[in-house]
Amino acid sequence: MYNYLDFEKPVADLEGQILELKKLAQEQGSVEMGDEISRLEKRSADALKDIYRKLTPWQKAQIARHPDRPHCLEYIDRLFTEFTPLAGDRKFANDEALQAGFGRFNGTPVAIIGQEKGSDTKTRLKHNFGSARPEGYRKAVRIMEMADRFQLPLITFVDTAGAYPGVSAEERGQAEAIARSTAECLKLRVPVISIIIGEGGSGGAIAIAVANRVYMLEHSIYSVISPEGAASILWHDSTRAKDAASDMRITAQDLFDLKIIDGIIPEPLGGAHRGKESVIDATGDIIAASLRSMKDIDGETLKQERRQKFLEIGRNI
C-alpha cells in the first residue's frame, strides 16, 4: 500500500478494495473474483489518470513532499559507482543533511552534491529533514573547489524546504555560507548539472543549483519561499498556501515556460514514488545527455554561459 495524499482518496478506496478482494480470493482459493478485481483495477487506473491530469500547483507541492519519493541517496546508489563520500567542512562539523563526494557516472569521474531528507523517523532526524546548516554548505564548497581543481563535472540533487533557520545556524553564519556556495557555483570551469528531485526551497536550494543545466522532475517544485511562508507574509494566513502556490508559479511546467529550467523529467503516473527505478533511470539519461552536450565546451565558456544564464533569468522575470 502507498501513502496516499488527501486528494488521492478515491484511488485509495479502490485500491483498498482490490487488496481485500485479492486477499479473500487467496484465502478461499477462488478465481471467481477475478472479473471484479479487474473491473476495480481499471476504475482505479482511470481515477488516478483523471486526478493527475488536472493537478493544481498546491497538489504538486504535496507530491513533491511525498515521504516515499526517491531521495538523494537512492539516486546516488543507482546512478553512480565507487561513490566515496566526504565529511566535514574543516571548520566546525559534518552536516548529514548535505551529502557530497566523488564517484563514477557511466565510468566518468564526477563530483556529487545533494540534499538528503531521510526516509523514516531515525534517518529524517539524522539528515535534519534535508535542511542543511552552514557546515553543509561549506562542505559543498569544498567539493566544488576540488571538482574545479581536478576538472570533474559536478552533479547536484536538490531536495530541501530550505536551509535550516535555527539560531545556532545563524550564529555560525548561515547567510554567508549560502552566499559563498552560490558564488562558488558561478566560478566553476566544469560542467554543472542540477536536478530538482522534490522540493527546491529558497536559498537553501539555489546554493547548489547554479548550474549550466537545470532540470526538474515533473511533480517537483522550485521557489524562493514555501507556499505556506508566502501566504503568511502576503495575507498573514498560512491556510492560504493553496493560493500562494498558484500565484508563485512553482511547478516544473511554469518554470520551464519562464525559461528558468532547461527541461522536465517525466514521472510515472501517480508520482515518482510509484516507480522509483524508472524515474531514477530517466534522470540518469538526462545527466548523460547533458554531459555529452557540454563535453567539448572549454571551462571559461562554461563559466560565462552559466553566469549569463542566471543574469538573463533575473532580467526576464
Swiss-Prot record:
Q: Where in the cell is it found?
A: Cytoplasm
Q: Which reaction(s) are listed as its catalytic activity? A: N(6)-carboxybiotinyl-L-lysyl-[protein] + acetyl-CoA = N(6)-biotinyl-L-lysyl-[protein] + malonyl-CoA
Q: Which cysteines are joined by disulfide bonds?
A: none
Entry keyword annotation includes Transferase: yes
> Keywords in UniProt for this one?
ATP-binding, Cytoplasm, Fatty acid biosynthesis, Fatty acid metabolism, Lipid biosynthesis, Lipid metabolism, Nucleotide-binding, Transferase
Output one GO MF annotation. ATP binding
GO CC terms: acetyl-CoA carboxylase complex
Q: What is its EC number?
A: 2.1.3.15
Determine the domain of life of the protein's source.
Bacteria
Major location (coarse): cytoplasm
Q: Which family does it belong to?
A: Belongs to the AccA family.
Q: What does this protein do?
A: Component of the acetyl coenzyme A carboxylase (ACC) complex. First, biotin carboxylase catalyzes the carboxylation of biotin on its carrier protein (BCCP) and then the CO(2) group is transferred by the carboxyltransferase to acetyl-CoA to form malonyl-CoA.
PANTHER family tied to this protein? ACETYL-COENZYME A CARBOXYLASE CARBOXYL TRANSFERASE SUBUNIT ALPHA (PTHR42853), ACETYL-COENZYME A CARBOXYLASE CARBOXYL TRANSFERASE SUBUNIT ALPHA, CHLOROPLASTIC (PTHR42853:SF3)
Q: What is this protein called?
A: Acetyl-coenzyme A carboxylase carboxyl transferase subunit alpha
Q: Which organism is it from?
A: Brucella canis (strain ATCC 23365 / NCTC 10854 / RM-666)
